[in-house]
C-alpha cells in the first residue's frame, strides 16, 4: 500500500497527470447529469450517434489538415444534435431509427475518408485512439484543460438553472407543454449540451465509449434510488468517483484511460445491482 501511495505521489508531480484527473472528473460530472435525463426519456443512444458524428468531424478535420479541430467538431456535432432531434420528431423516422442511421452512416463515411485521404502513416493507430480514447494521458494540454473547465461549468450551470423545466420535460412532456413549458426549447438545450459533452470526452474515452459515461452512472443510481434528485446526485458522485479511480488505476497499471474508466463504471453498476437485489436504499 505504501509503495502505491509513493508511486501516486510521484506521478502527481507531473502536470499531465493532474490535467487528466481534472478533465476526467469534469467530463464525468457533466455526462452523469445529462445521463439521468436521457435514460428516463429513453434517448440513451443519442450519445452513441453523436459520438460517431464527432468521429466523422475529426476525420474531415484530418483530411483538411486542420490542426485545431475542436471548433469544427463542436459545430458539426451540435448541428447534428439539432437535426437528430428534429428528425426524431418526424412520424416517418422514429428517434431510435434516426440515431441508428446517423451512427452507422457517420462511422462508415468517416473511416472511408480517413482511408482515401490519409495524412498519417499510422492510420490504424489514429482510428483506435479516436474510437477508444488516447492510450496515453500525455495528450492533454493546459489549453484543453481550461477549455474543458469553462464548457463544463457552462453545462452544469445550464442543468442547475433549468433543473425544474428539465425535470418536467423528462417525466411528462405533454403535461409540461400543457402548462406552458417550452418543451421543444428544453429538448433542444439538452441535445446541444450533450453534444458539447461528447466533444469534450473524445480525447479521454473515445467515441465508442462515451455512451458508457452517460448510461452507466444513471443506471447504477436508479438501482438504489427512486427520487429524481437523489438519482441525479448519486449518479454525479458515482461518475466522478469512477472516473478518478479509473484514471488512477490506468496510471498505476499502464492501461488505456477510457477503457479503465468504463470498466470501473461497470463494476459500480454490478455493486449497485447487488444492493438493489438485497433491498438496499430506496428513497
Region roles according to the model:
Residues 203-259:
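Transmembrane alpha-helical segments in multi-pass inner-membrane proteins
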Residues 16-28, 67-78, 149, 199-212, ...:
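Structural signature of hydrophobic alpha-helical transmembrane segments
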Amino acid at each position: 500500500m505504501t509503495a502505491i501511495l509513493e508511486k501516486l505521489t510521484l506521478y502527481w508531480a507531473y502536470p499531465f497527470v493532474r490535467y487528466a484527473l481534472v478533465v476526467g472528473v469534469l467530463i464525468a460530472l457533466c455526462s452523469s447529469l445529462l445521463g439521468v435525463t436521457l435514460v428516463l426519456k429513453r434517448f440513451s443512444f443519442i450519445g452513441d450517434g453523436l459520438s460517431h458524428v464527432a468521429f466523422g468531424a475529426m476525420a474531415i478535420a484530418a483530411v483538411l489538415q486542420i490542426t485545431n479541430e475542436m471548433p469544427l467538431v463542436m459545430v458539426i456535432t451540435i448541428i447534428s444534435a439539432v437535426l437528430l432531434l428534429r428528425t426524431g420528431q418526424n412520424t416517418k423516422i422514429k428517434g431510435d431509427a434516426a440515431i441508428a442511421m446517423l451512427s452507422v452512416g457517420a462511422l462508415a463515411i468517416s473511416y472511408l475518408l480517413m482511408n482515401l485521404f490519409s495524412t498519417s502513416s499510422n492510420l490504424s493507430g489514429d482510428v483506435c485512439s479516436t474510437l477508444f480514447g488516447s492510450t496515453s494521458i500525455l495528450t492533454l494540454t493546459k489549453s484543453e484543460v481550461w477549455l474543458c473547465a469553462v464548457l463544463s461549468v457552462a453545462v452544469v450551470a445550464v442543468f442547475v438553472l433549468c433543473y425544474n423545466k428539465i425535470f418536467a420535460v423528462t417525466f411528462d412532456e405533454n403535461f409540461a407543454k400543457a402548462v406552458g413549458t417550452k418543451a421543444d426549447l428544453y429538448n433542444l438545450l439538452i441535445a446541444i449540451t450533450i453534444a458539447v459533452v461528447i466533444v469534450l470526452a473524445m480525447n479521454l474515452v473515445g467515441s465508442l465509449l462515451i455512451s458508457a459515461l452517460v448510461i452507466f452512472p444513471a443506471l447504477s443510481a436508479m438501482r438504489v434510488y427512486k427520487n429524481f434528485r437523489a438519482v441525479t446526485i448519486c449518479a454525479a458522485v458515482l461518475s466522478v468517483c469512477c472516473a478518478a479511480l479509473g484514471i488512477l488505476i490506468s496510471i498505476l497499471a499502464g492501461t488505456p484511460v477510457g477503457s479503465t474508466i468504463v470498466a470501473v463504471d461497470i463494476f459500480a453498476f454490478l455493486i449497485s445491482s447487488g444492493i438493489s437485489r438485497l433491498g438496499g436504499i430506496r428513497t
